[in-house]
Design a protein with these regions (language model features):
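ATP-binding N-terminal substructure of ATP-dependent carboxylate-amine bond-forming enzymes
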Residues: 1-98
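Short, charged, surface-exposed secondary-structure boundary motifs
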Residues: 40-42, 58-60, 105-112, 151, ...
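Active-site nucleotide/adenylate-binding loops and adjacent lid/helix of ATP-dependent enzymes
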Residues: 104-180, 189-193, 220
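Protein kinase-like catalytic core scaffold
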Residues: 139, 195, 252-255
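ATP-dependent carboxylate/phosphate-activation module, predominantly the ATP-grasp catalytic core
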Residues: 169, 174-234, 245, 257-284
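A short glycine-rich, hydrophobically flanked beta-strand micro-motif that places a catalytic Asp/Glu
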Residues: 236-248
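Cysteine/selenocysteine-centered motifs that mediate thiol-based redox chemistry or coordinate metal-sulfur cofactors
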Residues: 286-296
Length: 296
């Protein structure tokens, strides 16, 4: 039996992890939350009341829970928690289900992501406030570090830039991408090989999560992006990235993350369980995938 701890278990990520692992007879799931959450409804084994990650006692409390419950693998289920724990992996009393600290640090910042992949054709053009002229408009601004579509804005006229003056370090201002948005769910094995890349259309989005998602065929252009990112950045197990079509019909990268996506179930039901295989990989198994020719 593999004892798996999920924190915070009440996030959309934590709920998808529960759905992905709850029927596996080799997995014993334990949900952990700092505050009362929906995790208490779905996790049979549920622990509540651990301090926030900003507390000086958090790691001590976490390791006690890990030891008391004989936890083998911890799955972080929130972006800030992922980065925090990746920086303290050596202090943890169990395995951590995410990529290395460098990858987590890059992924948490859209600016760092674009800098690492600078020069690639799929990186959108970005601007500083002082460089923007009327002919560049419309543009799009989003926080460098953020989630859930919080703080985004479309820049239609020069006056809109007044809200962003002095905030070049806080925001990414890029070309406007007017086309359809997609998520590509990926898995990288221990050899660094991209095993799976499954693309889905984000038809309806609520607080940054696709609540209506449809599998689509992976275009050659997007497969090139997946391979290029996987070649430049080191992943271990599950990860995903998001792309959007530009005005010329080419795919441009929005962001990436070394974790389960909230709507990854759409790809999971085709036959490849991303987080389950990540757990097995952490436990020493070599992971392969067989193409599922399901007519979606």
């Amino acid at each position: 039996m593999i004892n798996v701890l999920v924190f915070p278990c009440g996030s959309e990520i934590g709920l998808e992890v529960h759905n992905a692992l709850k029927y596996d007879k080799h997995i014993n799931l334990v949900g952990l939350s700092s505050v009362s959450s929906h995790g208490r409804v779905v996790y049979k084994n549920y622990i509540e009341g651990i301090s926030f990650i900003t507390s000086d006692t958090f790691m001590e409390e976490l390791n006690k829970i890990i030891e008391d419950n004989n936890i083998d693998v911890l799955i972080p289920a929130y972006d800030d928690v992922i980065l925090y724990l990746s920086e303290r992996r050596d202090e943890l009393k169990c395995k951590l289900a995410t990529s290395n600290k460098t990858t987590c640090d890059i992924a948490r910042s859209k600016r760092k992501t674009y800098e690492v992949l600078q020069g690639e054709w799929y990186i959108p053009e970005t601007f500083k406030v002082s460089q923007i002229t009327e002919k560049d408009l419309p543009l799009f601004a989003k926080p460098d570090i953020g989630q859930g579509s919080q703080g985004i804005m479309r820049i239609e006229k020069m006056e809109d830039l007044n809200l962003l003056k002095g905030k070049d370090d806080e925001y990414i201002i890029s070309e406007l991408l007017p086309g359809q948005e997609y998520t590509v769910d990926c898995f990288t094995n221990r050899k660094g090989e991209l095993v799976v890349a499954s693309m889905r259309m984000r038809k309806r989005i609520k607080t940054g999560i696709s609540v209506n998602s449809v599998i689509v065929e992976l275009p050659a252009e997007v497969k090139q992006i997946a391979d290029a990112i996987n070649e430049k950045i080191v992943f271990d197990g599950v990860w995903f990235f998001q792309v959007k079509l530009d005005r010329n019909g080419h795919y441009k990268l929005l962001e990436m993350a070394p974790r389960v996506a909230g709507s990854m179930s759409t790809s999971r039901v085709r036959g490849f369980n991303y987080i389950l295989n990540t757990v097995y990989q952490l436990m020493g198994y070599d992971i392969k995938a067989i193409d599922n020719l399901l007519d979606y």
